[in-house]
């Protein structure tokens, strides 16, 4: 299931506008997995206790977070199966894998569904500052050549901490977060919602 992502482009039909954007969901998933490993190490170094089982589970959750993507990435998301998001399909596939693996993904699924007491673990997978976004913004920026999306993901991860089981950012990291939010907005304007890409998506 994971290897299937090798055949799905990360930015769908944006390669029509940006020919260099040939990177895949598989590459992105590996990148997000790496950033998650860095984030777990960083949070643990600040005295936040994370069991090895929790670290493995949250890494599994981020590695599998995109397995529900179909052909052309987001383009056909609401066309093939109406009203069902790729996150829901990812969850369905994870639950199927969990049955085949005798429950070894149970904790990862709990985290993915935000049903685990340590809320910050889910926020690392799916939140305003999750490892998914930190990876795809830099990756998409690099392969499209749109430099505005090039964020300092390593700096942001160093600024992360936990308070009351929620993910927080140290005050000295506010400037990096402002840059991150600006970069995300600019990438939507210049890449994800580019008029030519959107026109091709409508035709498809």
Segments from the language model and where they lie:
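Sequence-structural signature of the catalytic-core scaffold of metal-dependent phosphohydrolases
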Residues: 1-60, 68-203
